[in-house]
């Protein structure tokens, strides 16, 4: 194939070309909600140059970090990130956050926040990833690799030494808010899906839908009933009786697990759309 390409400029190459979508989760939400703004950010519309949704989120996060570092409207910013502190401004927990937030913001600004810093958070947001999930991702993607570099002697010290988990949790909250503000169709879509599941769960019904290629999907998460059973075992070697406890779980097929259904509905629907897109592409290639 390569030789023919070099020798013949009119040769039609048959080698497969890998094509990657721009955050397919957001693409599906933008398309379903007919959001022209979000659709443009993930390259669903024709633009003069490719759009970069990750950079937009990074820019938003950087703006927030700079604002916190400069202690501009700090109370308002903290409450927007953690609404549960409303009415608790005199609590020790709140005062601790107010003291450490500017320090953590400065650490991230010194380290640098780019599109790669927010990319994984952006990609999993539409699949119901929450702040604690974002935090775990930042630990895996940045804190642990930085610690490994220190161990190998590649860098002198960890940029977030002694505050790795706090720094990850802090940026996770910043990224979550930035993503919500930049990609509004995703939040609206997830809210709609979860409201639908809530309504069905109230009537103890499973969620059902059909994908664009006609594949029927049923989401039915039911509760588990758990019972703890004490057992007595005789150890022949030690010649003693041992006590133990086991948990026996049995699924209740007649009661929908509302909490599990809420957390699973968005990723399940988007994954089913991803699968349909892949299958449609394969079928189209076969027809061509």
Explain the meaning of each model-derived region.
Residues 1-288:
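Conserved catalytic core of nucleotide polymerization and phosphodiester-bond processing enzymes
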